[in-house]
A protein has these predicted regions:
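Feature 14080 marks short, conserved micro-sites in well-ordered regions
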Residues: 1-182
Length: 182
């Protein structure tokens, strides 16, 4: 066998690192999606096509030099769509998506409206059928169990386990899926 190692891409040219995959890395077919920084647009969503060795920035979610840090709290593939946490700099960390079949990227939900972030998936993320379950903070009820139905694009709080503004932190210490029961 030919055991060799090579640099695939110099995303942040010069001596500085691009920190590829620091927050997320997901393979979809021949394409690897990951977080990286080119030194001018912060940590953003990038891709590398292994079939033709091309590398490109998929989305500059937080335009300018700031970082969106895609996948810092969560990243999961559902069909052809990547779901991940990211910040655009004005709404804090929220749930975002990228459709790999048509290259569109969008904020799925602004769970904690305003400049605060809901930090989706900080404690858990689990897919049951077409529904993504995750922890999030809406700014009023603390970290609770939330869901996003990928088939109809609806997002809702499943339960206020620790009623009031306290945090139940679902999934912080354990998450188990048995059949379709979380």
């Amino acid at each position: 066998s030919n055991a060799s190692t090579w640099r695939v891409a110099d995303i942040n040219s010069g001596a500085a690192s691009s920190n590829p995959g620091q927050y997320m890395e997901i393979l979809v077919g021949d394409t690897l999606y990951f977080s990286a920084s080119d030194g001018s647009s912060g940590d953003e969503l990038w891709a590398h096509d292994t079939s033709n060795a091309s590398t490109w920035q998929v989305a500059d979610i937080r335009s300018g030099t700031g970082s969106s840090n895609p996948g810092q709290q969560m990243s999961i593939l559902v069909g052809d769509t990547l779901y991940f946490s990211a910040t655009d700099g004005s709404s804090g960390y929220e749930l975002w998506a990228h459709d790999t079949s048509n290259s569109s990227t969008w904020r799925v939900a602004d769970i904690q409206s305003g400049s605060g972030g809901s930090n989706p998936g900080q404690y858990m993320e689990t897919l049951v059928g077409d529904t993504l379950y995750f922890s999030a903070d809406d700014g009023s009820n603390g970290y609770e169990l939330w869901a996003h139905d990928t088939s109809n694009a609806s997002t809702w709080r499943v339960a206020d386990i620790y009623s009031g503004s306290g945090n139940s932190n679902p999934g912080q210490y354990m998450e188990i899926l048995v059949g379709d029961t979380l």
